[in-house]
């Protein structure tokens, strides 16, 4: 049986080469609202569940504004327990850690509504509410606080005893470097896995044209305005917010707890409380998140696209008559073997637009050669066509339209 991708022409063999340009390429084609909400619901489910496992009871901090919520939750938990207030400390902790994020996001929803887009804001609002409700519900699963993938950090802490045990007994998951390395290694794997999974989840959320809320609104707005890669911006924003949350929830709270405990090596408000494994591995987690987000969602990676074919005039007319925002250059080339004339269409565009451009090319010329070259550096200006007030419907069959 002859391979349909191979065609013999005389003493030449024509082979069809193909490959996916984008990670999660199928997600880019999801435009129906109910499918987008379904995908966000699935991600929100795992975001909440894994957030409880990897963050809430491990001593790591979540990304973005959630770090501040978690820090406030741990401080409130300490104040309630130390002052013996007659309220359920676990419930207060869970409410502040999960549900308070919805309230904190309200001003940022307003920013997104007016500065980014209404659909972006509504999809983000949906994800923030659903993921935090899931996380709040999962935090009440019996025994979830003792569920660990690699090592039971609670039992290890009890075995070590001393100041670390006293602090952890009050709900502050703090690890010191002087103790057994088993906890540090476990925490490192937690950071590695959760950082990678967050990058996968977050990239899919961005492709759908939403975000995880919080300070991501500011990062996304700045990224859109300045055309900067969002992975690096997310790392900066997440690190700053984490340092605030960590200072409140671990450094301050742990030091206050240690004031009533006689310990020579770890002084309250000392360097051991600040430069703990919790701090180092959460920063490591944010680095993993930033690197893989840029890899999975290269929003501002520019490429040079060259299209070789016989219907480039129809291709040009199609791009100009549709809502595609591609600036094109055309020239004629001659084949070195056949001496046949062919046209080449060249454009510089964002890598995330290549799948869309390829689909447009295939509508006009299924046999065209589509080539992509990554651009390392650019120096100059780019022009982006604004969406018209009234959308012009694209030509459904550009080849027949050209012939007519």
From Swiss-Prot:
GO terms for cellular component: plasma membrane. It comes from the Bacteria. Keywords: Cell membrane, Membrane, Transmembrane, Transmembrane helix. It is found in: Cell membrane. Its main location: membrane. It is a multi-pass membrane protein. Pfam families: DUF2179, YitT_membrane. The chain crosses the membrane at residues 37-57, 92-112, 122-142, 188-208, 230-250, 272-292. This is Uncharacterized protein MG432 homolog. It comes from Mycoplasma pneumoniae (strain ATCC 29342 / M129 / Subtype 1) (Mycoplasmoides pneumoniae). The lineage of its organism: Bacteria, Bacillati, Mycoplasmatota, Mycoplasmoidales, Mycoplasmoidaceae.
